[in-house]
């Protein structure tokens, strides 16, 4: 386990927080949302990597390296970083990383290391998908002593709403929710059973490459969740998890209350991240509850910056399609040349 690097100097971070990278102000707590790439903002990327490793390591995961930055973060066509910035304390509250998929075979998807995508998923879903990952809140904003901590996750949703407005072609959100090895097995199994019961993947779109065997066919769970509807069984789930001295992970709770058509996939172990257990999920953007859309995707006060960023994503999307077209033309040309050689 390597020692985590020292914090990056505030002045270096602030120098990279230029106006064109700001998306919006948050609905609460007076914070700000920025997006950038590692190439654009190396100091911010370094600080994000430090804070991610610190937060994940404390929870029982992490890479074990001095900073959590991988090849997908730094690739030219890799992930964008979204951060919540506290202008009062001049520090990063938390963040996500995301990538906009524009084809059935996008590059640098973290989920492809652990999940197998069906042809249907690649063809009908991936080209219209935003992949999310590495959601974190820095340790200082996980305590009750910090008055802004209660808004940290809500602020991240403000940022996600802005990214969806930036990318109107996106119809799906795809990613993973994480549970750490310290999470009690009985609580985990009850939660996963509940998720699969109410948010099943009936089309078999995504499967774990090495899924965990969770024994979810045990009749115990049918007997346990005896309520007549989602709400009643949700209360039973809360009670069962509290009985194990655990709680529903905040991100899981947030996703469950975002859309009624969420889909839940297999759970896998991630050996590259402290053997945490990760469950794949998919959300359909048009099905997000109207009140959530109104809360997180409104335009007031941030229209100008979004216009500039939307144009950037549009150009990147066109460039990506051009690259795909050229690759297809090159393959067709090579195939034609091979055919001519055989004829000779």
Language model features: what each stretch is:
Residues 1-39:
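Conserved N-terminal entry element of GNAT/NAT acetyltransferase domains
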Residues 24-74, 78-97:
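Short amphipathic alpha-helix that is part of the acyltransferase structural core
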Residues 63, 103-262:
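Acyl-donor binding region in acyl/amide transferases
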Residues 73-83, 262-263, 273-279:
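A short helix-loop-beta-strand connector motif used in the catalytic cores of GNAT acetyltransferases and
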Residues 85, 280-309:
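Long, continuous compositionally biased terminal/linker segments
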Residues 92, 140, 181-186, 273-276, ...:
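Short catalytic/ligand-binding loop motif for oxyanion handling, primarily in non-cytosolic enzymes
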Residues 300-326:
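Short, cationic low-complexity segments
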Residues 327-344:
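Short, basic, low-complexity termini and linkers enriched in Ser/Thr/Gly/Pro
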């Amino acid at each position: 386990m390597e020692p985590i690097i020292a914090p990056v100097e505030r002045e270096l971070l602030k120098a990279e927080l230029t106006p064109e990278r700001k998306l919006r102000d948050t609905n609460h707590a007076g914070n700000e949302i920025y997006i950038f790439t590692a190439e654009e903002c190396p100091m911010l990327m370094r600080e994000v990597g430090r804070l991610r490793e610190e937060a994940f390591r404390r929870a029982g995961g992490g890479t074990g390296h001095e900073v959590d930055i991988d090849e997908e973060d730094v690739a030219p066509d890799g992930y964008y970083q979204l951060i919540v910035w506290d202008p009062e304390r001049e520090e990063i509250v938390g963040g996500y990383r995301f990538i906009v998929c524009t084809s059935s075979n996008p590059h640098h998807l973290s989920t492809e290391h652990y999940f197998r995508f069906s042809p249907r998923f690649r063809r009908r879903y991936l080209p219209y998908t935003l992949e999310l990952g590495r959601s974190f809140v820095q340790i200082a904003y996980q305590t009750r002593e910090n008055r802004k901590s209660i808004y940290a996750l809500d602020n991240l949703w403000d940022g996600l709403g802005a990214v969806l407005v930036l990318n109107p072609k996106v119809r799906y959100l795809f990613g993973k929710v994480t549970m750490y090895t310290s999470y009690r097995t009985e609580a985990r199994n009850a939660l996963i059973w509940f998720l699969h019961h109410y948010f099943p993947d009936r089309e078999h779109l995504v499967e774990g490459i090495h899924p965990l065997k969770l024994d979810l066919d045990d009749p115990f769970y049918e007997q346990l969740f005896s309520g007549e509807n989602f709400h009643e069984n949700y209360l039973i789930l809360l009670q069962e998890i509290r009985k194990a001295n655990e709680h529903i992970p905040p991100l899981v709770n947030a996703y469950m209350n975002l859309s009624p058509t969420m889909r839940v996939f297999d759970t896998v172990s991630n050996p590259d991240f402290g053997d945490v257990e990760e469950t794949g999920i998919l959300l359909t953007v048009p099905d997000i509850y109207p009140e959530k859309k109104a809360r997180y995707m409104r335009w007031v006060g941030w229209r100008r910056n979004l216009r500039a960023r939307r144009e950037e994503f549009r150009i990147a999307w066109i460039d990506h399609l051009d690259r795909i077209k050229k690759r297809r033309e090159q393959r067709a040309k090579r195939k034609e040349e091979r055919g001519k050689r055989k004829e000779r």
